[in-house]
Amino acid sequence: ADYFDKLAGKFGRTYVPGRSWQALAHGLLRLMPPMVIADMGAGEGTLSQLLARTAKQVIAIDNSPKMVEYGARIAKENGFSNLEYRLGDIEEPPIEAGSVDVVLFSQALHHAARPQRAVESAFRILKPGGRILILDLASHTYEQAKELYAHVWLGFSGVELHAMLEKVGFRDPEVSVVAREQQAPNFQTILATGIKGG
């Protein structure tokens, strides 16, 4: 008990053997019902493959032919028959209207020239009752991100994301900061969610 008493108040910041966000994610995914998920701006598809472990189907969208080729190859090597990579733009994803349960933008929306258009497309491809999840950087002033990471936008404020979701017609939009980096430039990650009515 002394060991845990000393850890009180810093448990989340201290190394604990076997405790990782990746392990927690695997556990939480097992609680999800089988769904059709669109992973927008999927890149190599690390997250897509994690989701494919429990999803009914994952559609990974990226505008880089090399990323799509690589992701598809790795998915095949790992036996993910329910994971499909498609070459396309997150503003006009090659996905049928009303066909997915969840649209996920994980650190992808800041790469869109027209982020509002990407959110509108997410609404279009979602089934009624489907959800949008946006994980992105909160507004920041680190201009080098444009050159270093090909960011088009320097993150988004909670107000901006809430307004984007509301404008399209998402119900119950919620926005919150979910992570803060300790080292400079101290990026914060913001989560925005909404539900398509119907």
Q: Where do the PLM segments sit?
A:
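Amphipathic alpha-helical dimerization/coiled-coil segments
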Residues: 1-9
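A short SAM/SAH-binding and catalytic strip from SAM-dependent methyltransferases
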Residues: 101-114
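A short glycine-rich, Lys/Arg-flanked "PGG" loop and its adjoining helix->strand segment in the class I
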Residues: 116-131
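Conserved alpha-helix/loop element of class I SAM-dependent methyltransferases that forms part
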Residues: 17-36
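C-terminal alpha-helical "lid/dimerization" subdomain adjacent to the S-adenosyl-L-methionine
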Residues: 131-193
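Class I SAM-dependent methyltransferase SAM/SAH-binding core
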Residues: 38, 44-92
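Class I S-adenosylmethionine-dependent transferase superfamily signal
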Residues: 28, 51, 122
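A short acidic, Gly/Pro-enriched loop at the edge of an enzyme's catalytic core
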Residues: 91-103
